[in-house]
Amino acid sequence: MLRTLLAIACLTPLAAAALPAAALAQAADPALSTVEELDAGLLRTMRAGGTAQARSKVIAPVLERTFDLGLMTRLAVGPEWVKQSPADQQALVDAFKRMTIAQYARNFDSFGGESFEVSPRVETRGGDKVVRTTLKIPKDAPVAIAYRLRQSGGSWKIIDVFYKNAISQIATRRSDFGTVLQKGGAKALVARMNAIAAKGD
């Protein structure tokens, strides 16, 4: 059974960040391809089943292509990022990547007829774009998910995920990460992310 999607974002109590109104872009926007690739990868991961380690091998390359994990780490760490040494910054990015892959592999654990429906309308938010999708779950309520994307290296990559179009993954993590950094610095935050990645449930 597909585990709750909110577990991916909820490292601390939820922090809501509503998406503001934005202009609609044309349907053929290249940002759609990124989200469609992610959705296809998530379905492959669920269909693969097996162990979390096996599913990680399926979803890892998809997340590396569709997410800007370096920028997501910087945004999640917030203002404290510039205070970290280059070595600590790299350690944080590596730990964030491991955590993200492990959480997706854990939560998308088996296939039960789920499907994704991507809205063809792409919204612009300054230099970023927002693509909305719906996860349809048999015998359960659909889950609205919005992705914020930014152009990087000639392609559009995801930099934030909004569950139910309101709960920002980055905002939620920034709240948690800030507390850990203040108490124990980069090493403590790396240890926390590694512990989350290693959890069996």
Predicted region positions:
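Low-complexity, intrinsically disordered terminal/linker segments enriched in charged
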Residues: V161-D201
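Positively charged n-region of N-terminal signal peptides that target proteins for export
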Residues: M1-T4
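Sec/Tat signal peptide C-region and signal peptidase I cleavage site
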Residues: L19-Q26
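Bacterial N-terminal signal peptides
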Residues: A7-A18
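Early exported N-terminus immediately downstream of N-terminal targeting peptides
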Residues: A27-Y104
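Surface-exposed, charged secondary-structure patches
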Residues: I101-V143, A191-D201
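Solvent-exposed loop/turn segments at secondary-structure junctions
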Residues: W81, R98-M99, E123-T124, I137, ...
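Short beta-strand edge/turn micro-motifs at domain boundaries
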Residues: P142-T172
